[in-house]
């Protein structure tokens, strides 16, 4: 969980970013946000144009067109991530302190029900469209809880080889999850609800954020030792490593621009271009703000949203909350 937030938005033109040899990025606009408490993962709901922020004891909804706070969903304890099930217009929010998942209505911004999970500290959370299940990655018990979205009940528990972090689905029956304490990547078969492969990510250390290119079958793990590890999703072969900023916590891939993003605690956003399935190059390290480690990609606008805190003493009152829009000058 991060510190109270300053919200940043970075906007990138699809064509300009993909083809510019030396792109020049800058912060373009600022929005006030406000509010107290830490945060974790960010999620874009493209249907409502909402940025959903896991904000410690509540979900904050920010209008991605105006940058204004439009609502909050309270009554939570220590939330981490939000998985969207668009067909049902529901969100599933992992609550690490309550060992549960809160089901929210994405249109009314209300809590519908709570689902206790069979693990401790549910953190990363992902929807797998192939099975219709939501999976929570339980950081303190080393397992994944499987929730059937038709019944909103836990239907299986999957033993994992270590402490799970972020997870992604390929939409074809597999979920991939970084194993932070082992420097590994695990593959879950969502038909059998079992891990069917585990791959070593060395020289990557402490992988956190994870993204996927479902077309080229490439996985992007961002690591604490300033590396992005690129892995073949079918064979587990390491395709490449790419230098990124320090202290990453999230990764995103934009299929329209072929860009991979790493948001880093050192106040940079590393942008990597996928030239082809086996070749990758850094095109920019965009200054953001120290602490801006988590992000969301808006696929409609190709904008990147991040959050960070205004500098201040530990436990000091929150102030100077601002949304920043950045892109090519």
Please provide the spans of the model-predicted regions.
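Predominantly soluble domains enriched in secretory-pathway, periplasmic, or organellar proteins
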Residues: 17-329
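N-terminal secretory signal peptides that target proteins for export/translocation
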Residues: 1-2
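Bacterial N-terminal signal peptides
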Residues: 5-16
């Amino acid at each position: 969980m991060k510190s109270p937030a300053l919200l940043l938005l970075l906007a990138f033109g699809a064509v300009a970013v993909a083809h510019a040899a030396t792109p020049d990025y800058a912060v373009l606009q600022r929005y006030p946000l406000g509010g107290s408490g830490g945060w974790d993962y960010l999620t874009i709901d493209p249907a409502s144009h909402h940025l959903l922020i896991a904000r410690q004891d509540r979900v904050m909804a920010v209008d991605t067109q105006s940058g204004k706070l439009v609502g909050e969903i309270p009554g939570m304890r220590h939330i981490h991530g939000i998985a969207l099930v668009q067909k049902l217009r529901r969100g599933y929010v992992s609550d690490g302190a309550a060992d549960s998942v809160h089901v929210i209505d994405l249109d009314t911004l209300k809590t519908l029900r709570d689902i206790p999970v069979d693990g401790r500290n549910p953190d990363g959370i992902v929807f797998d469209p192939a099975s219709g299940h939501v999976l929570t990655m339980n950081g303190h018990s080393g397992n994944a809880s499987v929730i059937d979205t038709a019944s909103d009940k836990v239907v299986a528990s999957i033993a994992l080889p270590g402490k799970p972090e972020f997870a992604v689905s390929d939409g074809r029956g597999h979920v991939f999850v970084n194993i932070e304490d082992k420097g590994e990547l695990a593959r879950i078969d969502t038909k059998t609800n079992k891990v069917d492969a585990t791959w070593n990510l060395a020289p990557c250390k402490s992988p956190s954020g994870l993204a996927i290119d479902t077309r080229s079958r490439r996985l992007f793990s961002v690591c604490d030792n300033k590396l992005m590890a690129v892995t073949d999703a079918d064979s587990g072969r390491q395709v490449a490593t790419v230098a990124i900023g320090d202290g990453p916590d999230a990764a995103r891939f934009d299929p329209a621009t072929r860009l991979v993003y790493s948001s880093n605690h050192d106040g940079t956003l590393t942008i990597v271009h996928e030239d082809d399935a086996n070749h990758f190059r850094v095109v920019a390290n965009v200054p953001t703000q120290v602490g801006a480690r988590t992000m969301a990609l808006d696929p409609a606008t190709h904008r990147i949203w991040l959050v960070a805190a205004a500098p201040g003493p530990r436990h000091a009152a929150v102030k100077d909350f601002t949304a920043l829009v950045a892109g090519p000058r």
